[in-house]
Structures are given as structure tokens and as C-alpha cells.
């Protein structure tokens, strides 16, 4: 009798190229693959890996968060903030410090504000010429768990110490907010 081999763990599941058929993205992948091969810098490896990622793993980041992270790192205005994703505007911030940003996408309002305050916006092919090894740059990304879908992940809703949101149709007092959630309806957890 032969032994049945379990092939469950044989395949390594990770992206080696982007799912998207966007030719410009594919060109960037080609460029950063070349850069990593020639420089062996971790910076290029990280950018290459993030270019493969799905849109949900390329979360947007606001201008205020970019400014905050730059300030935390104590970086001057010559440093380039690198985001493999979208940079969005933040209307709550009246003042936008001068900063240089490199991103896959920059929203119209964010672009307007960066340029208005004397900053620069780089594309990734321009960044490859300016900083091929990632010198004088700061890599940053948005919060991946900020999506609404993440509020439903975790311990089952209704279990003690769970803050997970249930998937509900009705949000009234008599439904998921009733038994176990208020002392007037059986008990309160």
C-alpha cells in the first residue's frame, strides 16, 4: 500500500506579478524588478512587492497623515514621501506644509494643494531617476484595517468582549441591540 501524500501545503500563494493588465503598472514592475536586481536595496524590493498588491492592500492615505509621518520622522522638505497607492486630500487641515510626494495616484484636490504650497509630485519612474536606492525617502502607507469590511471581522458578534459588528438588515432597538445588549431585555453582557 502506498501512502497518500498531502499536497495541501505544496503551493506557495503569493503574487509574482500584478493581476491588473494595466500596461503602465506592468512597466513600473519591469523597472523596479530591474532596479532591485541591480541595487539589492530593500527599498526597491518593498516597492516591487507593493506594486503587485490588490487594491484593498493599497489603502489611500490623506495629506494630513503624510505630513504627520514626515514630521514624526523629523524629515526636512527635501525628503520624498513614497506611497504605493492613492494620496487624498484632507479638508480638515487648513495648512499643508511644503512636501515632496511620490504616489501611484494623487487626487485632484490633493495635487492642487501640494503644488500650491510649493511641493512636488513625482511618479515612480521619476523617483527611479531621483532616488534609485531610496535615499532621502520615507515609505508610508494608509491603514489597511480602516475599511468598513474589517468591522465585521474578529470574534463572533454577541460573544463576550467582542466588538465585531454583525451583518444586519435592520438596525432597530428590537434586533441586535436587544437581548444581551440591555438589561431590560433579558441580560446585558
Curated annotation (Swiss-Prot):
GO terms for molecular function: RNA binding; structural constituent of ribosome. GO terms for cellular component: cytosolic large ribosomal subunit. Its main location: cytoplasm. Keywords: Cytoplasm, Ribonucleoprotein, Ribosomal protein. InterPro entries: Ribosomal_eL18, Ribosomal_uL15/eL18, Ribosomal_uL15/eL18_sf. The keyword Transport does not apply. It holds the Pfam family Ribosomal_L18. This is Large ribosomal subunit protein eL18. Belongs to the eukaryotic ribosomal protein eL18 family. It comes from Aedes aegypti. It is found in: Cytoplasm. It comes from the Eukaryota. GO terms for biological process: translation.
Amino acid at each position: 500500500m502506498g501512502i497518500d501524500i498531502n499536497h495541501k501545503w505544496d503551493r506557495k500563494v503569493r503574487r509574482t506579478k500584478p493581476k491588473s493588465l494595466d500596461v503602465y503598472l506592468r512597466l513600473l514592475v519591469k523597472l523596479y524588478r530591474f532596479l532591485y536586481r541591480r541595487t539589492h536595496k530593500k527599498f526597491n524590493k518593498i516597492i516591487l512587492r507593493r506594486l503587485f498588491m490588490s487594491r484593498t492592500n493599497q489603502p489611500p492615505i490623506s495629506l494630513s497623515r503624510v505630513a504627520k509621518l514626515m514630521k514624526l520622522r523629523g524629515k526636512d522638505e527635501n525628503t520624498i514621501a513614497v506611497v504605493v497607492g492613492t494620496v487624498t486630500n484632507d479638508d480638515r487641515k487648513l495648512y499643508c506644509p511644503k512636501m515632496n510626494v511620490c504616489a501611484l495616484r494623487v487626487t485632484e484636490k490633493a495635487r492642487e494643494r501640494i503644488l500650491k504650497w510649493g511641493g512636488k509630485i513625482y511618479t515612480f519612474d521619476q523617483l527611479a531617476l531621483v532616488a534609485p536606492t531610496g535615499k532621502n525617502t520615507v515609505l508610508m502607507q494608509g491603514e489597511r484595517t480602516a475599511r468598513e469590511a474589517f468591522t465585521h471581522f474578529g470574534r463572533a458578534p454577541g460573544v463576550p468582549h467582542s466588538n465585531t459588528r454583525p451583518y444586519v438588515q435592520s438596525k432597530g432597538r428590537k434586533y441586535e441591540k436587544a437581548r444581551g445588549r440591555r438589561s431590560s431585555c433579558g441580560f446585558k453582557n
